[in-house]
From Swiss-Prot:
Keyword Hydrolase belongs to the record: no
Naturally occurring in which organism (per UniProt): Erythrobacter litoralis (strain HTCC2594)
PTM info: An intermediate of this reaction is the autophosphorylated ppk in which a phosphate is covalently linked to a histidine residue through a N-P bond.
Tree of life domain: Bacteria
Name of the protein in its database record: Polyphosphate kinase
Swiss-Prot/TrEMBL keywords: ATP-binding, Kinase, Magnesium, Metal-binding, Nucleotide-binding, Phosphoprotein, Transferase
Single biological process term from Gene Ontology: polyphosphate biosynthetic process
Molecular function (Gene Ontology), one example: polyphosphate kinase activity
């Protein structure tokens, strides 16, 4: 992998048919989940970590059904015949997706059966009825009567009783009862407050699923009846929220929309393979909505529920614990984050470096008497947020505090409404941004009174201000006191709070204004350099790439001889390695202990890559239409040389060199694991064992970080 163009046969005409140029977005998303599922079979991982990947794959598929499948069902029902970028109608996509979902679901069950045996061998027993001895039975019975039975409400399904509402992701049981020659069907919905698995006390772990526990003691629910059949079912509903642009009260509109989502159209009804026929017929009749799919599962319903078992206290079955580092540069200044930033820009690489640095940035601003103003954009902040607490404290301390709270963050709408209300009560000026655009930018600014006048300190991130995801997502936090970026950040906030379109930005690019054009210009510059015989290369790292105009621009660059290396964790509509179209493009995906989430865009700029002259950006945006045209995002150029070296020659290069947890995308859409070869390299392990460049401070001279170098054949 050098920086010089690769020659190609320019006599070949590039493909013109959509299906030959682009992959289908939905199928590419499912291919990502297939790679996640493959980690559940990774023998090099501890057992409970493999179970975690299986659980994540289940959660991913649930969300896919609730959002993407629901969207396709809606298009089919409305008669929409607009084709996708790869030329498929909604009906064709839906058929392909449903077939692929069936394959993935069957594979999940096969993997679960295998893992269940291995877990039992390791002393973790799940749904193993043979291990329920007299002592365990006694404890389970007492637990059922004390903690389960009071929460259950059996409901008869007959003309005298309305059919009960089953909430989204609702899990329930149907029992066919008999007494005096008459049959009756009863439904028991399992409250979401109950855990999916109950652990029986004991040295060896024994977990019993909530549905099997209720079934075991069902006679206590129906005294005097004979139970002649039973079965477990699960419902997934349309969970997307659509907000009309003319909405007058955004908060009230979202509260109503959240209520509607709970009652969205049924998209999938999942039942056990051995479901009672009488109960099944009734359930189908009552839930037979147009477009709903019925799935019979030979195994566990709602495999995401296995997350309960991952919490088992067995360190020997999990990854070795890891404690993130706190940057030495900040410690050298006795924890004064502002002094550390004044000395030099810093980039923090999460989760290898502590998210507490970000929290401390806001917390210190809240109590610093010289800080006069704080502005913060919040997209996802979690259920417990020290950042929100610090903003509240700042407002209570008399500082001017502005928070942009995005209500349209999917599945976090209700939590964000809560945070907005808490912030407003404390005196924070809360802004909800645009009705038709999401504010996805990750930015905070602090204005501080100093001897020379007011100075602005900024934080730009690639990830959310979320304490939980910051422990498992790889992201970058860039701290700077560069006055140019401070002025740009102020204009960005004014854009969101007052709709004042930023003009004459000095460094930042902002979508939907000029972020797309900034990346276009950088790609075009590489084409000019390639045609002039100069080194020309593009390295990009992102979560997804689906924007066809951006993909076409990269195809043009490939045809011009620009070498392009993409690290795309998830959806990739770009088809690499196609003669005459994308010969010079290679795409890889990294799936490992941590979830790759940072976005980095780098361009050779006429010199061999990686080099000091390379143009490097970090961003909140992926290369998707929504990020480039329908969201407020930021693209931040990296000028500081130490930070530049860290982002390009440490973070991005390590991702390209990784061969232990990497998959390479083939021209036909399949992914193959990258061969380790003579020298193995795991980028997650490298970051866990080597400190970053910009955060080391004076310690950098005492102990240099091992320098990475390109090697031939690396992706």
């Amino acid at each position: 992998m050098g920086s010089h163009p690769i020659t190609q046969d320019n006599d070949l005409d590039p493909p013109t048919e959509p299906g030959e140029r682009y992959f289908n977005r939905e199928l590419s998303w499912l291919a990502f989940n297939d790679r996640v599922l493959a980690e559940a079979c990774n023998d090099s991982y501890p057992l409970l970590e493999r179970l975690r990947f299986l659980s994540i794959s289940g959660s991913n598929l649930d969300e896919f059904v609730m959002i993407r499948v629901a969207g396709l069902v809606g298009q089919v029902q409305r008669g929409i015949d607009e084709v996708s970028d790869d030329g498929r109608s909604p009906r064709e996509q839906l058929n392909a997706v449903v077939a692929r979902l069936e394959e993935l679901s069957e594979r999940q069950q096969d993997i679960w059966r295998n893992l269940r045996v291995q877990l039992a061998d390791a002393g973790v027993h799940v749904a193993d009825e043979e291990r329920v001895n007299a002592e365990a039975y006694g404890w389970l019975k007492q637990h059922f009567f004390e903690s389960i039975l009071p929460l259950l409400t059996p409901q008869a399904l007959d003309p005298a009783h309305p059919f009960p509402f089953i909430s989204n992701e609702g899990l329930g049981l149907l029992f066919t009862l008999r007494r005096g020659g008459e049959e009756l069907v009863e439904m028991v919905l399992i409250p979401s407050a109950l855990p999916r698995f109950i652990r029986v006390p004991g040295e060896d772990a024994l977990y019993i699923s909530i549905e099997s526990l209720i079934t075991r003691f069902a006679k206590e629910l129906f005294p005097g009846f004979e139970i002649v059949g039973d079965g477990t079912f699960r419902v997934l509903r349309d969970s997307d929220i659509e907000i009309q642009e003319e909405a007058e009260d955004l908060v009230r509109t979202f509260r109503s929309a959240i209520q509607r989502r709970r009652r969205g159209q049924v998209i999938q009804l999942e039942i056990e393979e051995e479901f009672d026929p009488t109960a099944e017929a009734l359930l189908r009749e009552k839930l037979d909505t147009p477009g709903a799919t019925f799935v019979k599962t030979d195994g566990m319903l709602g495999i995401a529920g296995l997350a309960d078992i991952v919490d088992e206290d067995r360190p020997d079955l999990k990854f070795d614990s890891y404690s993130p580092r706190y940057p030495e540069r900040v410690l050298e200044h006795d924890g004064d984050i502002f002094a550390a930033i004044r000395e030099k820009d810093i980039v923090i690489h999460h989760p290898y470096e502590s998210f507490n640095v970000v929290v401390d940035f806001i917390r210190r601003a809240a109590i610093d008497p010289d800080v006069v103003a704080i502005k913060q954009a919040l997209y996802r902040a979690g259920t417990q947020s020290e950042v929100v607490d610090a903003l509240v404290e700042a407002a209570e301390n008399g500082k001017s505090v502005t928070a942009v709270v995005e209500l349209k963050a999917r599945f976090d709408e209700e939590q964000n409404l809560y945070w907005a209300n808490k912030l407003e009560r404390a005196g924070v000026q809360v802004i909800y941004g645009f009705v038709d655009w999401k504010t996805h930018a990750k930015v905070a600014m602090v204005v501080r009174r100093e001897e020379e006048g007011f100075r602005t300190y900024c934080h730009f991130g690639t990830g959310n201000y979320h304490p939980i995801t910051a422990k498992i997502y790889t992201d970058l936090s860039y701290f700077t006191a560069d006055p140019r970026l401070g002025r740009d950040a102020a204009k960005l906030f004014n854009f969101v709070t007052g709709y004042v379109e930023p003009r004459e930005l000095e460094m930042l690019a902002v979508s939907p204004i000029d972020l797309r054009e900034t990346i276009y210009a950088a790609i075009d510059n590489e084409m000019v350099n390639a045609q002039a015989g100069k080194p020309a290369a593009i390295w990009m790292k992102m979560n997804q790439i689906t924007d066809v105009d951006m993909i076409d621009r990269l195809y043009e660059a490939s045809q011009a001889g620009v070498e392009i290396q993409l690290v795309v964790r998830g959806i990739c509509n770009l088809r690499p390695g196609v003669p005459g179209m994308s010969d010079n493009i290679r795409v890889k995906s990294i799936i490992g202990r941590f979830l790759e989430h940072s976005r980095i865009y780098a361009f050779a700029n006429g010199e061999p890559m990686p080099g000091t002259s390379s143009t490097v950006y970090i961003s909140s945006a992926d290369l998707m239409v929504r990020n480039l045209d329908r969201r407020v995002e930021q693209l931040v150029p990296i000028d500081n040389q130490t930070v530049h070296d860290q982002v390009l020659q440490q973070v991005l290069l390590a991702n390209l060199l990784d061969n232990e947890q990497s998959w390479e995308l083939q021209p036909d859409g399949s992914y193959f694991r990258v061969e380790v070869g003579e020298k193995s390299f795991n980028c997650h392990r490298y970051f866990m064992t080597n400190p970053s460049l910009s955060g080391r401070g004076g310690a950098l001279e005492a102990g240099a970080v091992p320098k990475l170098a390109l090697r031939k054949g690396a992706v």
